[in-house]
């Protein structure tokens, strides 16, 4: 128990969960970002195998999501020197392109906007347990 945040690798990391239509929608985007090595880690909240990519990291304990105050999935973070310097919440193709500084992102037929879903780390039924385990 403590208030220290788990350290994140420099670059871009994203938080997702399978039980979110927006996160399912952007799987092709996550695949592209993984293949191009733009994305460092995908933290998944509810299914350790989602998405099935080599950079997917199990956050079903919600420790990383809770400590980084993730309220919505997907949330894309920019990390420098181990510290979050910026974030974007939900899926907006134009916003993600600008955030990642890339021109082509996702398949042509992908919906360009979806607001995302509530993060499990802010689920009222889990708050007490998460605060006891990981601090406030």
Where in the sequence are the language-model features?
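Non-globular targeting/processing and membrane-anchoring segments
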Residues: 1-11, 19-21, 25-39, 66-73, ...
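Thiol-based oxidoreductase modules, predominantly thioredoxin-like and allied folds used
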Residues: 37-61
């Amino acid at each position: 128990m403590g208030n220290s945040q788990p350290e994140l690798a420099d670059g871009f990391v994203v938080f997702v969960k399978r039980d979110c239509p927006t996160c399912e929608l952007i799987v092709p985007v996550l695949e592209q970002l993984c293949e191009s090595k733009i994305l460092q880690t995908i933290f998944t909240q509810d299914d350790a195998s989602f998405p099935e990519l080599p950079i997917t990291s199990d956050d079903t304990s919600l420790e990383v999501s809770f400590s980084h105050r993730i309220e919505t999935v997907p949330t894309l973070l920019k990390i420098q020197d181990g510290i979050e310097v910026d974030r974007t919440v939900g899926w907006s193709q134009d916003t993600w392109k600008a955030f990642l500084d890339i021109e082509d992102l996702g398949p042509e037929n992908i919906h360009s906007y979806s607001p995302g879903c509530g993060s499990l780390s802010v689920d009222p039924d889990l708050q007490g347990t998460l605060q006891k385990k990981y601090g406030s």
